[in-house]
Amino acid sequence: MTTALLTHPDCAGHLTPPGHPEQVARLDAVLSALDGADLVRVTAPLAAEDDLLRVHPRAYLDSIRAASPAEGWAALDPDTYLSPGSVAAAFRGAGAAIRAVDMVMAGEAANAFCATRPPGHHAERETAMGFCFFGNVAAAAMHALDHHGLSRVAIVDFDVHHGNGTQNLVEDDPRVLFCSSHQMPLYPGTGEPADTGPHDTVVNVALPGGADGRMFRAAMEREVLPRVDAFAPELILISAGFDAHADDPLAGLRLTEADFAWITGRLCDLATAHSGGKVVSCLEGGYDLEALGRSARAHVDVLIERGTGG
């Protein structure tokens, strides 16, 4: 079996103003780092409207299209900009996640990594925010449940920022376990550990600024991995944000590439135990280009090793 890499040139068509941290160079850094890796490269399709309607209302999709500018940028909030190519890029991001689920469920790949932008985990049901437009991972989870007939899907988000959008989109469905580790206090100001969702299927792990890999690993071992194990997911989805890296300029955690490789391996262990190794990972944050590239490669190298039976 192999690891699939899903991406599309359209994702470079989402342009942000000069100096914006969510820039085209992020995707270039990831893809350059993965050059030469033993991956099956797959062209990410556009998401079908019905797939996005599982997590966003039609009026919201229409509003995003309507806000798309003919040139320049349209600001949806102080951080989140549309350019003429942004809508296509956002549809490719969601389409990549959904196609990756189809490939892994069909046995066409052991696992998959979606190298797309813009990211998705801050997009709420009717609100674009935090660089995000559509809930890519949430849409993939709902597709797995409704299209593939799964009963239990786990999402693990180790981006340095709380995955408020993903939580907003999945917490009402008891078939989804959502776990987020994140620095607190930090944008977007959500993700208190006491917030466990209406069905007790939300696990929020708040880490203080300056927390290092030892603290991250201990929190994962204590709070996230046992919950995922007990949930026995038939598929694990990862929101792979690498902005908890010590070199990242937007936050203050102190993780290294080794920590990202470690959590990837531990999640793969759980996937092996419960789902035949089925894992789909989607790129979220990461804003120091060199650290982002190294971290993404460390993450994907573990997926490749596990996908080939290592």
Where do the language-model regions lie?
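HDAC/HDAC-like amidohydrolase catalytic core signature
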Residues: 1-156, 161-310
